[in-house]
């Protein structure tokens, strides 16, 4: 009879070896403190920008109070257009609420600042010797932020997961801005580590384990093989762009070896290969969602595991989209992944995927036919094909949920073969990137180009702000031009054009203009002022607010000059196309203040209903438009 000790500790011959625990990122104490301070600085900046916090002057800085009115945190900041707060990370401190017996503030460990009980510890530490804690700030300010008890644990988890992602990046070597300015798109993409400029919890990837992050997170840059499944064709949707038929789709997206091997797997399973289509799957998704969650489909052989593909792929910033590193000129593959990040489960809906190629073809056509967009070097990256499996019980139930977004994929053309000789590319996120020494990549591009800061900024706006505005003004069409959906075309660091991508879910036609059959879902008719938010919120507040401050605070370009150049670029468009400006006014004095973090705090796992995004949005009054100052005198200056 085996005793209890033997049962608890089986021999090496019989026990299953467990993986070694993953070690925490190797940050020294000061780097760990700096990480906390950077998160806190962004938190106080963006939460103040969204008017959830109301900073009060206090000495050389500002304090924010909890729901009782007691000051809890102190920071120093400069203020900029669009109510941007540029918070000094080294100044952030949690306030010691203690008082001495005489009712005066205690000065233990730091210098007192005006106000009863307000003590700011000196030297970068709190009174107990620790660094400030971003999660503690959320706890202190929970009621002020409107964060419910139900959502609090989810947001704290998301915030910690974001910090884990940041810590992993900071523990690894990284190139300088000057080095990155001479790098190609895949390398630039790997080292863009700022995350979304507005969201505080911006790269949580909740559900992706620590060891899994080492394998599949974009910053790891580890090449991986995708898992391939065969899905019964009668239970699947396959949509192809105008350039493809079934034969060309298979030839383009599978190697000859994969085609032969996958067909052999199906024949060996007693199945007819012609009755199946193939789906690329993230290895994490197969292990965590499909095999355990869709086992009946596997047992029925409605889904058949084909194995790994021949090519190696690398995850991009969006986590679920892959670049083919074996042949970077081949299409990107976008896969479903049941991980929560920045307010959404990163799955893919077969129903949504079905229309993607048609939407992409339509958008590609209207931009190619537009002389102005061609002049500006704008090109839509077409989504050549999509596939989705709908034979599972969740689809049969008729209930729409995240469980119906588990198995689908999309192929999108790569920008690399579309670059002209001498051009290189980088995600728009690069203009907001700074290296470990605080040097902006934008500054390094300016230096490489040999242009002045004014000339470079004007060129950037000519291929970003103005084309997005032109699409809205001339085509009643709004895209989501955030920093991942735009890829800049650069020549020696100088902007000469842009690729637009990933627009099937993030494009909207805002009028009753005719649309091709099958893509009516992208129509979202709104009033003129709400239409303007496609520029005011998504471009001015979402991207250019941060860029203007970055260039200003690093001494590259004064922010007043930045906004003057932006106004001038739009004013010249208005002169050329006055007929497009009759209904919309991008120079209006103010616009509705749409708030992203308010959405995330309301529900960290489902910020908006993608089928009804407009009604999901949250507003906090109005923002003054920095373009309005130059309404009547934008002309002249930099050309």
What are these regions (language model features)?
Residues 2-462, 491-639:
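Nucleotide/phosphate-binding site architecture used for ATP/NTP-dependent chemistry
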Residues 153, 482-483:
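Short loop/turn and capping residues at structural boundaries
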Residues 337, 483-484:
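Short, well-ordered beta-to-alpha junction loops that form the rim of enzyme active sites
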Residues 456-475:
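Conserved kinase catalytic-core helix
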Residues 476-482:
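Catalytic-loop of the protein kinase fold
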Residues 486-488:
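Hydrophobic residue at the +6 position relative to the catalytic HRD Asp in the kinase catalytic loop
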């Amino acid at each position: 009879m085996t005793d209890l000790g033997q049962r608890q500790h089986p021999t090496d011959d019989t026990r299953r070896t467990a993986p070694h625990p993953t070690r925490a990122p190797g940050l020294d104490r000061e780097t760990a403190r700096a990480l906390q301070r950077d998160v806190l600085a962004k938190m106080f900046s963006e939460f103040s920008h969204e008017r959830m916090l109301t900073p009060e002057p206090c000495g050389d800085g500002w304090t924010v109070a909890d729901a009782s009115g007691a000051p809890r945190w102190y920071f120093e900041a400069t203020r900029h257009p669009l109510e941007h707060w540029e918070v000094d990370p080294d100044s952030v401190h949690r306030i010691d609420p203690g008082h001495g017996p005489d009712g005066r503030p205690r000065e233990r460990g730091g210098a007192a600042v005006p106000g009863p009980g307000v003590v700011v510890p000196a030297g970068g530490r709190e009174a107990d010797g620790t660094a400030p804690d971003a999660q503690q700030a959320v706890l202190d300010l929970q009621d002020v932020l409107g964060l419910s008890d139900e959502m609090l644990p989810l947001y704290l988890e998301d915030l910690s997961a974001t910090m884990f992602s940041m810590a992993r990046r900071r523990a690894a070597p990284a190139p300088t801005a000057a080095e990155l300015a001479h790098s190609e798109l895949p390398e630039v993409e790997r080292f863009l580590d700022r995350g979304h400029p507005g969201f505080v919890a911006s790269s949580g990837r909740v559900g992706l384990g620590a060891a899994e992050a080492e394998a599949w997170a974009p910053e790891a840059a580890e090449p991986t093989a995708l898992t391939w499944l065969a899905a019964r064709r009668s239970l699947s949707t396959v949509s192809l762009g105008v350039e493809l038929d079934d034969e060309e789709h298979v030839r383009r997206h599978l190697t000859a070896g994969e085609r032969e091997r996958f067909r052999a797997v199906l024949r060996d399973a007693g199945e007819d290969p012609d009755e199946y289509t193939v789906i690329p799957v993230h290895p994490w998704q197969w292990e965590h969602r499909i095999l355990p969650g869709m086992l009946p489909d596997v047992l029925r052989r409605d889904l058949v595991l084909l194995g790994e593909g021949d090519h190696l792929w690398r995850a991009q910033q969006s986590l679920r989209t892959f670049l083919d590193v074996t042949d970077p000129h081949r299409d990107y593959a976008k896969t479903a992944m049941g991980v929560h990040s920045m307010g959404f489960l990163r799955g893919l809906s077969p129903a949504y995927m079905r229309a993607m190629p048609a939407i992409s073809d339509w958008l590609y056509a209207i931009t190619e036919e537009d002389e102005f967009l061609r002049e500006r070097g704008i090109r839509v990256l077409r989504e050549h094909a999509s596939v989705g499996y709908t034979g599972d019980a969740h689809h049969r139930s008729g209930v729409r949920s995240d469980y119906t977004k588990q198995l689908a994929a999309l192929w999108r053309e790569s920008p690399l073969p579309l670059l002209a000789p001498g051009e290189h590319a980088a995600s728009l996120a690069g203009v907001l990137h700074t290296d470990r020494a605080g040097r902006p990549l934008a500054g390094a591009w300016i230096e490489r180009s040999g242009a002045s800061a004014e000339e470079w900024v004007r060129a950037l706006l000519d291929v970003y702000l103005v084309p997005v505005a032109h699409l809205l003004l001339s085509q009643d069409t709004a895209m989501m031009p955030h920093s991942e959906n735009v890829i800049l075309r650069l020549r020696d660091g100088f902007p000469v054009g842009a690729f637009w991508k990933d627009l099937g879910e993030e494009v909207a036609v805002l009028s009753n203009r005719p649309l091709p059959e099958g893509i009516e879902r992208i129509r979202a008719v709104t009033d003129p002022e709400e239409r303007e938010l496609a520029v005011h919120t998504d471009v001015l507040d979402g991207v250019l607010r941060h860029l203007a401050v970055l260039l200003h605070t690093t001494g590259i370009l004064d922010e007043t000059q930045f906004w003057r150049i932006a106004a001038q670029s739009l004013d010249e468009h208005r002169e050329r196309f006055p007929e497009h400006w009759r209904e919309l006014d991008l120079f209006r004095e103010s616009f509705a203040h749409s708030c992203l973090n308010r959405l995330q705090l309301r529900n960290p796992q489902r910020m908006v209903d993608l089928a009804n995004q407009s009604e999901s949005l949250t507003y906090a009054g109005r923002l003054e438009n920095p373009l309005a100052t130059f309404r009547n005198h934008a002309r002249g200056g930099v050309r």
